[in-house]
């Protein structure tokens, strides 16, 4: 069951104790944190987000700064919530070594428990290209994902404007240049493809097609492609099971992309 509390009082937050260990629980607000274990540390008041996973994993992030967590405890750990002197105290204690993180929330802005249905990794499918090398592999193994009859003949091919990701021929024998983007493509991708096409056209003295291959493109990018006589091929990621057996994208990589 999902429960979302906006600017709750401490006693309301304490009710989420029942969900700890069974559902994902998230608290966000102004807090201080203490770590006690092999060393000791204190984090002063700041806006932070605390995440408690059912497997016992605990993570505390500063909401406005760097990607590394302020504190964290791996599983097996046990979390608890209590109210002390009007303050919400979230405690994470490791079960295998004597270490704990104690977070003192002076003001909780948001508290929620998430449904556990469909939350298991074996039920999820991770569908993001981890790199442009993944895209090349997909095209190499099945060139028809670009279009029927496409025949790739080279990767990382140099031209006067740089290095083209993939080149090949269509079923009519025309030379084709592919520019690959694993995330949403912007105008810079369209401009780069145009430069490659013009360079190959000048070097080869023949008609050259240019295709931007990406999961999606911005509106400005689409208009620029049309202006230059270039094409866009939507290539969906190959689903990868999030089973821990493959290297996953970081959040930074996931969010990276061209938004122009």
UniProtKB/Swiss-Prot annotation:
Disulfide bonds: none
Localisation per UniProt entry: Cytoplasm
Single GO molecular function: single-stranded DNA endodeoxyribonuclease activity
Highest taxon of the lineage: Archaea
Gene name per UniProt: nucS
A cellular component annotation (GO) from this entry: cytoplasm
Record-given protein name: Endonuclease NucS
Pfam families named in the record: NucS_C (PF01939), NucS_N (PF21003)
Organism: Methanopyrus kandleri (strain AV19 / DSM 6324 / JCM 9639 / NBRC 100938)
EC number: 3.1.-.-
Function: Cleaves both 3' and 5' ssDNA extremities of branched DNA structures.
Broad enzyme group: hydrolase
Family: Belongs to the NucS endonuclease family.
InterPro entries assigned: Endonuclease_NucS, NucS_C, NucS_N, NucS_N_sf, tRNA_endonuc-like_dom_sf
Keywords on record: Cytoplasm, DNA-binding, Endonuclease, Hydrolase, Nuclease
């Amino acid at each position: 069951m999902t429960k979302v509390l906006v600017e709750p009082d401490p006693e309301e937050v304490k009710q989420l104790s029942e969900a700890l260990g069974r559902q994902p629980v998230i608290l966000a607000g102004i807090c201080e944190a203490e770590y006690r274990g092999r060393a000791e540390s204190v984090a002063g008041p700041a806006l932070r987000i605390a995440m408690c996973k059912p497997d016992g994993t605990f993570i505390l992030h500063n909401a406005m700064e760097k990607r590394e967590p302020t504190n964290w405890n791996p599983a097996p750990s046990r979390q608890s919530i209590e109210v002390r002197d009007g303050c919400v105290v979230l405690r994470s204690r490791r079960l295998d070594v004597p270490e704990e993180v104690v977070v003192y929330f002076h003001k909780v802005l948001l508290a929620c428990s998430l449904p556990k249905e469909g939350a298991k990794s074996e039920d999820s499918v991770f569908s993001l290209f981890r790199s442009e090398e993944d895209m090349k592999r997909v095209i190499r193994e099945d060139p028809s994902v670009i279009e029927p009859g496409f025949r790739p003949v080279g990767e990382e091919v140099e031209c006067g404007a740089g290095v083209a990701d993939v080149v090949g021929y269509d079923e009519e024998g025309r030379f084709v240049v592919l520019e690959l983007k694993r995330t949403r493509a912007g105008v810079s991708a369209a401009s780069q493809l145009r430069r490659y096409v013009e360079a190959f056209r000048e070097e080869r003295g023949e008609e050259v097609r240019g295709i931007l291959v990406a999961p999606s493109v911005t509106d400005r990018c689409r208009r620029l492609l049309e202006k230059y006589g270039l094409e866009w091929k939507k290539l969906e990621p190959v689903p990868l099971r999030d089973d821990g057996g493959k290297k996953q994208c970081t959040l930074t990589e996931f969010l990276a992309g061209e938004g122009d």
